[in-house]
Amino acid sequence: MERKNSLPAANALLLAVVALVGLNLRPFITGVGPLAASVSAETGLGLQGMALLTLVPMLLMGVFAFAGPSLQARFGARRSVVAALAVLSLGSFLRLFVATGWQMLGTAALLGLGAAIVQAVFPGIVKLRFPRHVGLVTGLYSAMLMGGGALGALMAPLIAAPARNWHAGLAWMAIPALLAAVLAARCLPRDGTPQAGGRAAAVLLKRPRTWLLMACFGLVNGGYSTVVAWLAPFYREHGWTSASSGGLLAIMAVAQALAALLLPVLAGKREDRRPWLWLTLAMQAAGFAALAARPEAAPVLWAALLGAGLGGCFSLSMIVALDHLPDPAEAGALSALMQGGGFLIAAMPPWIAALLHDLTGSFLAGWLLQLACIATVTWLYWHVDPRSYESAIRPPTLRKELPIETAPSA
């Protein structure tokens, strides 16, 4: 259990970096939905083509998350994060000039690459710099990540409307990404001796627990990617405007941010996080069931329920992965692998939902698919008992592969 002593004042600037980095990892995804009609009309992307704007970044977040431990060992965490944030800024800036579907997909790939590297490396930095406050700082990081999603959904139509140009509604995101790169370069600690994250990753891939965490993270985030891609178009089909449907997505993201920040604090009072994970899954199930059965009854409430469930589950999933190992490099490697496999899984549901929509003329089947995924994750998390962490990661016959190390104090 985490100690409750206060964070040193010297870490305040580093916490600002945590917040600003998290803020930049979702706007480029959530900003597309409210502008989907305009983007589709100019680039020629159909419903399944628009789904690729979510699928491609998610795939890259998965593929390059596996490379995170090796990048950190070879280039260092600080250099990797700064370079990735610069790539995020460039990808958003290039959206000022895209005119075709392929160009739009190219920027999505560039943005997914930048976000993937940050997400793979950054949890290890949190574990290293704040070992006694992993839950609190991970909650802040996750909350800002979700808050960035709200910002993207809200600002994209607001900036695009007066400019009468959807390009501006997406390209403005280059500014906070560049600011985050500059602040990270100045404030993140210098890279020291290379750590053993790459070797740990190879060993962890042999553990069934790693694959279980991947499956849980992927199925839950498949719900997130589906909602981000199709909640606004879903309500556009019900007669909502771009701004109002984007506002609904922003409400969902705000609820995500609040839950991502608050639930880790509440869950930190006990070692077993599963009751809180099951609570978040119940909220997701209620939200998706409501979208399927009564979408117009209380849209704001449905969006808030989904957001709270998705945001809280994301944050707690990250903490559970970091809880498994005391060493920052090894814990970061496990988190990167969980995200790698997870995002590969999460990339597919938006495209599947688009395909089902083309076949049935409705998003109903897509919402029902997410209910099945939630039921699966609820059962899988039953096996993630904190008493099993040690044996699941370091079986008695293989403990020499991952020697126990002690994290530095913050």
List each model region and its residues.
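Helix-loop-helix hairpin linking two adjacent transmembrane segments in secondary transporters
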Residues: R132-L136, L140-P189
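Helix-to-loop junctions at the C-terminal end of transmembrane segments
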Residues: F64-G76, A259-D272
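A late C-terminal transmembrane helix in Major Facilitator Superfamily
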Residues: L325-L364, Q370
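Cytoplasmic helix-loop-helix junction between adjacent transmembrane helices
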Residues: T107-A143
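Helix-breaking motifs and short loop linkers at transmembrane-helix boundaries and internal kinks
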Residues: G44, G76, F97-W102, P131, ...
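Conserved MFS/SLC helix-loop-helix module at the cytosolic interface between two early adjacent transmembrane helices
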Residues: V63-W102
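Extracytoplasmic gate region of multi-pass secondary transporters
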Residues: V32-G33, P208-A250, A255-A260
